[in-house]
Amino acid sequence: MKNIRFKALLHLALLLGVSSLWAQQVPATAVIAPTSNYSYHDAFAPFFYSKNGTSTRSASGQPGAEYWQNRADYQLTAQLNEKNNEIVGTGIITYTNNSPDKMSFVWMNVDQNLFDADSRGNAIIPLTGSRNGARGQIFDGGHKIKSVKVVTSTKGKVTEVDAKYVIIDTRMRVMLPQELKAKGDSVKIKIEFSYISPMEGSDRTGVLETKNGKIFTIAQWYPRMCVYDDIQGWNVNPYLGASEFYLEYGDFDVNITAPSNHIVVCSGELVNPTAVYNAVEQNRLAQAKKSDKTVFIRTADEVSAGANASVSTTKTWHFKLKNARDMSWASSAAFILDGAEINLPSGKKSLALSAYPVESSGNEAWGRSTEFTKASIENYSKRWFEYSYPVATNVAGNEGGMEYPGIVFCGWEAKGEDLWGVTDHEFGHNWFPMIVGSNERLFAWMDEGFNTFINSLSSADFNNGEYKSEAIDFHKMAETFTRPDLETMMSSPDNMKEANIGVLCYFKPSSALIVLREQVLGEERFDLAFRTYVERWAFKHPTPDDFFRTMENVAGEDLSWFWRSWFVNNWRLDQGINTIKYVKNDPKQGVVITVENFDKMAMPVVLDVKTKSGKVSRIKLPVEVWQKNKVWSFKHDSTEEIESITLDPDHAFPDNNEGNNIWTAAKGAIEKAIILDGYLGTYSNDKAPAKIVFTEENGVLNVEITDYPQFSVVPIGKDFFESKTAGLKFQFNESKSGFDMIVNDSQKIPFTKDK
């Protein structure tokens, strides 16, 4: 009876303890500090994606076999009233419903309504410190809709029927007199509208006073179709100022009428240059289209000569643009205009233009704008995806920097490196979100963050690194990226403090991609995956999951731990050096280094180990060391005493606590290794069939029990060892001829060393 009870107890101990380790080997570990907040289950949990792939969006991250998106083609006219800052226009929108759903109404954006005194966006502008709204200007803002008609054509006869519509803040719902059928039906809607431009319109549009006349930078100027997609149907989030735009693709045909002394530049290609430029300007324009160097089309002297002249006549400028999501323009009598040829990888050409006042001229300022524009477009075209527009125009305005397809508005006072930075950034937006049409209103990091990331690469390339930035010290950025009051990057800009937008939408996502490229995937794998994402979703509407899935599938890595740490959560990183000990207390036999992950974020481990002779060895451990551990020990095959060990020596990870990153022989302790030779051997119990074998590897005592996987134990006292994972303790006698295996801190099973 006693023997049966003993065998049952031993079996129970093994079943409850050691069997929990089946199919996994526990690595060498040090005692886990109770202060660690790290949970490897949280970091590496399965099922990151809340839904499977669909017929429209593949689980691999590419558009599905049945992917669809709707289309909006625009015929637009605009007349500029310079005195009143008023734009009067018409828009004929051909909207094509490619969705599987029928429609009885459509939604449009009327974004100028942000500047209505009663708008929601105006109501939430703080008393001070905001870039949004009209900066306190009191004026009659907002779109004035004169009429909305549905246009039909039957046997050559055109009919216009008034449509019922309702305006709700910055959205307009138009009821269709006839239901729009699914999968290819279209409707033509004609809208007459006008509005007065704000002087400063949420830093995205405005009017700048210069000594030679006003500069009009015109955007969000016509009613634009909302996106109807497979994610949430109509996307009708209001324009509140902080979040930007989500728009359908289509072709544009635009006629802009302005005072005859104005130069007008636009997103598209000018198709009537002979009607608006004089013979000299036409000749210079032709030269610019074939020149790698900047060519003046309209000079500063010519601007000054015609400055502030009273003009009663007008010119109409005609522009066309294909497969774009928006169209913006600028107009002024104050514009100096210069240009140069853009060379694209396919052999096609585009045209770089710069329009700026004399106050901005000079080689230290906007005189280099076209050079910057050309370099930026050529770089991104070669590296990621070819530029798709016939013109790239940089306009000096009173915006800090704002992007539209083929045209950007940058600060008129910018110079040198600042001008390069804002020019390169705004033109980078022609890839994100102009070519890759993500939902800016919800996920600003998918355009601002991606763009800031590619800017870091182009700046390193430009003019042999003229404006190359130093490598980011991520230790210094760690607190900024992860402070407790910071929202997550997945938040909409409308759902975060305005002061946090720069961090969460620009710098943190950009930094995440830098870390992913340089420390996790490597440049080659990252660049292929990122380029594939651009190619797959060019002129389409990706979601965050489409990006995450593409990066994983092309790179061949499960990156859920990375997305969780950086994007979904606001997790901190704190890796630290735990203990150092020489194998058998002999520096010639190597050193065992133990590192610990103290906080929620998991990242790879990089250490520099410097020996007494001055030799430095770099050690890299993959992130998988944290996949089932809070603490990790490894052996470094050094042959002499260690002088210092530095964790993350390049400050390449956002480690929030540098205090535990450096160990030096002068200040740090070396843990004495327990000489394990006396414990090694095979142990038996004459009342049980199991044998227990103790072996040593790299200074770690390992335990093998018959028919059970090996595990390791750590010392917890004199001749006393424990495996917390197995739930077992081993108390050796002083002569080390045997031990008691302790189960549940109470039951003892004696074993004796075999002779």
Task: Report each predicted region and the residues it spans.
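Beta/coil-rich, acidic/histidine-enriched accessory regions frequently appended to metallopeptidases
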Residues: 83, 536-672, 692-693
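Hydrophobic alpha-helical and helix-loop surface patches within well-folded domains
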Residues: 5, 23, 35, 39-52, ...
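Solvent-exposed beta-hairpin/edge-strand motifs
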Residues: 107-158, 259-262, 610-620
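Peripheral terminal and inter-domain segments
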Residues: 602, 609-616, 620-628, 645-651, ...
